Amino acid sequence: MDIIHVPILGTCYPQLMRIIAKRTLREFWLSAPRYSDSKGPLEAWPAEATKASWNSPQKVKAQFRSASILKNGRAVFNIAGNKYRLVVSIDYQRRICFVKFIGTHKQYDQIDAEVV
């Protein structure tokens, strides 16, 4: 885990990931009964990600081996036993994940994950 050294009194704080747009995940599983099986995995993913300290794509792959690393700081995660795809944009320097897309494989095939 990376540590941020704060000059005031020499305190140190671990810098963990922040997830932006978690609401998008909740809206997805609430959007249709057929997506209700994604609720547990979509609650678990941010819980795991916020404990991480990803400062490189290699750290993402070390934690989530099935994740696909794309250009432009994008990563694709398999959700609910590979039934759904989650696309995030990761700012490794600031340790922020921006949720960009969640959908089925068919929906994922219709987007450009490096742009969405």
Language model segments and positions:
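Basic, Lys/Arg-enriched alpha-helical interface segments
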Residues: 1-83, 91-96, 105-116
